[in-house]
Amino acid sequence: MAAKEERWRELAEVKRELAERDWFPATSGNLSIKVSDGPLTFLVTASGKDKRKETDEDFLLIDEYGKPAETGHSLKPSAETLLHTYLYQKTDAGCCLHVHTVNNNVISELYGDEKQITFQGQEMIKALGLWEENASVTVPIIDNPAHIPALAENFAHHAAAGSGAVLIRNHGITAWGRTAFEAKRVLEAYEFLFSCHLKLLSLRPQLVK
C-alpha cells in the first residue's frame, strides 16, 4: 500500500500542475501512473471528475486487464483506460498523460491527413532526449474512432518506447515517460512545439504546409 500511496501523491501533483494550465476543460483528459509490475497495477483517473478539484476519489487502482483492482467503491475508470493498459503492457513507461488543448487539437487537424507532424531544429527538442544538432522529432497522428478497443489497438502500434507521444485527431495528445517527471516533461515539450508552430503559421500564413 505504501507504493500506491506514493504514486497517488505523484499523480495528484501532476494533475494539480496541469489543471493550473487549464488543460482539463469540461472534465476531459486522463492520467495514470504505474504502481507495480508483477502483477501490473496502475492508478488511473476516475471518469467524469472535475480534475481542477482534489478529492479522495480522483484515482482508482487498475489491474493488468484494465479492470478495477479493488472493490468497495462505485468509481468508474476513464473510458480510455485500455490505452494506458496497452502502454504499460508493451513498454517500460511508468506514467501516461492525456490532455485536450486547443493547440494539440488544431495541430492534429492541420496535419491529420499526413498522419504525422515533424519538428526540426527547435531547442525544445532536447527535452525529448535528442541532443544532436538540428535534431528532428516526428509525432504520429492517429484517427479517433468511437470504438475504444479500435482506438487502443491503433495507439498500441505507436507505443514502442519508454517515452513518447501520439496525437489523436481532434481529440488530444497522449504522452508518456518512465516516471511522472519525464512524462510531464515530454508533454510540456510537445505542447511548446505545437504552440510555437501555430504562432509561426499565424505570422507567416504562406507556410501552412
UniProtKB/Swiss-Prot annotation:
UniProt binding sites for Zn(2+): 98, 100
Enzyme class, broadest EC rank: lyase
Cofactor note: Binds 1 zinc ion per subunit.
Keywords, comma-separated and alphabetical: Amino-acid biosynthesis, Lyase, Metal-binding, Methionine biosynthesis, Zinc
Cofactor names: Zn(2+)
Signal peptide limits: none
EC number per UniProt: 4.2.1.109
GO biological process, one term: L-methionine salvage from methylthioadenosine
Gene Ontology molecular functions: methylthioribulose 1-phosphate dehydratase activity; zinc ion binding
GO CC, one annotated term: cytoplasm
Catalytic activity entry: 5-(methylsulfanyl)-D-ribulose 1-phosphate = 5-methylsulfanyl-2,3-dioxopentyl phosphate + H2O
This protein's pathway: Amino-acid biosynthesis; L-methionine biosynthesis via salvage pathway; L-methionine from S-methyl-5-thio-alpha-D-ribose 1-phosphate: step 2/6
Family: Belongs to the aldolase class II family. MtnB subfamily.
NCBIfam families per record: PRK06754.1, salvage_mtnB
Subunit structure of this chain's protein: Homotetramer.
Function according to Swiss-Prot or TrEMBL: Catalyzes the dehydration of methylthioribulose-1-phosphate (MTRu-1-P) into 2,3-diketo-5-methylthiopentyl-1-phosphate (DK-MTP-1-P).
Official protein name in the record: Methylthioribulose-1-phosphate dehydratase
